[in-house]
C-alpha cells in the first residue's frame, strides 16, 4: 500500500488534432484537469468544483437525463450532490476514477469521464469505464460526440488506459445511436445486475487509434 501512496503525480500538458489538455492528478494536494475542444473552443471538460453543485443537482433531478441510468439513484438532494463533488475531487494513484463536468460557454451542462478505473485480473490490462450525460437542450449538436471522443482519447493517450468500456440499457436509443452509427463500434450483449446495462462496447487502444475519431485518426 505504501508503494501505491507514494506514486508520483500524473502531470502532462499537450495539444492534439482536436483538443488541448492540462492534466495534474495527485494523491497529495489538489488535482486539476481541463480538456478544451479545438472543434468547439467554448467546450471544456474539467474536474468538478463546489460551484457546480446547483447545475449538477438540476442535471440529476431531470428525469429526461437519468431515466436510463440507475447509477444516478439517490442524487436528488443538495447534500447528496455535495458529497458526490467531494468524492469526485479526490484523486488516488493508481487511478480509480476521473469524473469530469461538461462546460459550454461557461455553463455546466453535463458530466462524464471515467467513472471506474481498474486492472483486469486475467491479464492486468488497465480498463476505464466511460460515460457521458448532457442536458437535453445540448444534445444533437455535436457536443456529446466531441466530449466522449475527448474522454476516450485522453483516457488512452494521457491516463494510460488499455481499454475503454462503455455500457447502456437497450432502451437508450440515442446513446446506442451515438455508439453504433456515429462512432461505428460493435456492441456485445451483457447482463449487468448492478446497473441493468444490456449493451457494452469494449474499445482497445489500438482500435481507437486507427479509428477516424481519435487524435491520430483526425491528424
What are these regions (language model features)?
Residues 79-80, 89-92, 199-200:
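Short, intrinsically disordered/low-complexity patches at protein termini
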Residues 64-87:
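Conserved GNAT-fold acetyl-CoA-binding loop/helix
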Amino acid at each position: 500500500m505504501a508503494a501505491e501512496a507514494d506514486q508520483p503525480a500524473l502531470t502532462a500538458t499537450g495539444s492534439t488534432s482536436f483538443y488541448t489538455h492540462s492534466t495534474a492528478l495527485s494523491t497529495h494536494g489538489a488535482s486539476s484537469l481541463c480538456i478544451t475542444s479545438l472543434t468547439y473552443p467554448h467546450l471544456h471538460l474539467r474536474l468538478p468544483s463546489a460551484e457546480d453543485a446547483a447545475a449538477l443537482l438540476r442535471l440529476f433531478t431531470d428525469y429526461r437525463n437519468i431515466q436510463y441510468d440507475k447509477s444516478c439513484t439517490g442524487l436528488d438532494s443538495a447534500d447528496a450532490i455535495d458529497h458526490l463533488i467531494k468524492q469526485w475531487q479526490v484523486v488516488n494513484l493508481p487511478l480509480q476514477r476521473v469524473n469530469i463536468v461538461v462546460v459550454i460557454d461557461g455553463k455546466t451542462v453535463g458530466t462524464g469521464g471515467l467513472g471506474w478505473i481498474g486492472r483486469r485480473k486475467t491479464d492486468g490490462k488497465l480498463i476505464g469505464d466511460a460515460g457521458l450525460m448532457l442536458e437535453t437542450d445540448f444534445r444533437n449538436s455535436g457536443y456529446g460526440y466531441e466530449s466522449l471522443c475527448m474522454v476516450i482519447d485522453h483516457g488512452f493517450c494521457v491516463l494510460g488506459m488499455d481499454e475503454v468500456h462503455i455500457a447502456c440499457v437497450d432502451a437508450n436509443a440515442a446513446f446506442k445511436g451515438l455508439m453504433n452509427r456515429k462512432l461505428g463500434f460493435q456492441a456485445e450483449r451483457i447482463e449487468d445486475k448492478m446497473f441493468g446495462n444490456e449493451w457494452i462496447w469494449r474499445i482497445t487502444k489500438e482500435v481507437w487509434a486507427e479509428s477516424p475519431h481519435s487524435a491520430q485518426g483526425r491528424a
